[in-house]
Amino acid sequence: MKSNARGATQPGQVVHCETTLFESGHWKRDKLSPMFVEAFAPFQELAARLLTWLDKSTDGSHDLSHLKRVWQNARLLAQEEEGANLQLLAAAVLLHDCVHVEKGSPLRDQASRLSAERAGEALRKLGWATRDLEVVTDAVLCHSYSAGLVPTTPEARILQDADRLDAIGLVGVARCFYTAGRLGSSLYQPDDPAGKGRALDDKSYALDHFPKKLLGLATGFTTIAGRRMARQRHAHLQEFYNGFILELGA
């Protein structure tokens, strides 16, 4: 695993910054927590710059806390993945959701492409080399489940696994029901909660999202550490789902 100094600050240095966030094509001023920037050490300066390219959103399942969790996951995965460049990986994590597309939008399957395009623009303005830029944009493009792409570089494999780890386990449970609430979905279908005799509809029922998507995610991990962590989190996810169904008497 490699790292270089481009965009890095001195170890322990805290960047105090005020970041400008996109919202519907307009720049907005908003203060960014120095502690959040510090979480991306030794790439605090890079984080402070790239975060200005993020859409401002009220989606708590794809907020700054999500970026921090994905970065924590990515650093763990990179320890066992040969050839990963930590700085390129940090840039990919920071920009992987820079264009926000709501779950119910017809453009949802284009979210990673749109984010990759903006990521390329951001890195070009920072003067990044074409090869490094391409590694980052490829990782951003491939990370999305909706895109259905297979990652081939270490950075892309790590980002995809790190992002998907945040969709399973207990955090995944919380994000699932949070998103369902935002979209106005019901908790479950009252006549057949487990969907044994009907087509699953996770746009209408939060619980349907477990068998339709979440419970199948653990089989698609491509990094060594990612597979191991996915098995652990999948067990928590399955236990929650089974317990929920049991309480409903279904």
Predicted feature residues:
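An active-site-proximal "capping" alpha-helix that borders the catalytic cofactor pocket
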Residues: V70, A111-R124
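His-Asp-centered metal-binding catalytic motifs of divalent-metal-dependent phosphohydrolases/nucleases
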Residues: L86-S105, A111, S115, V135-Y145
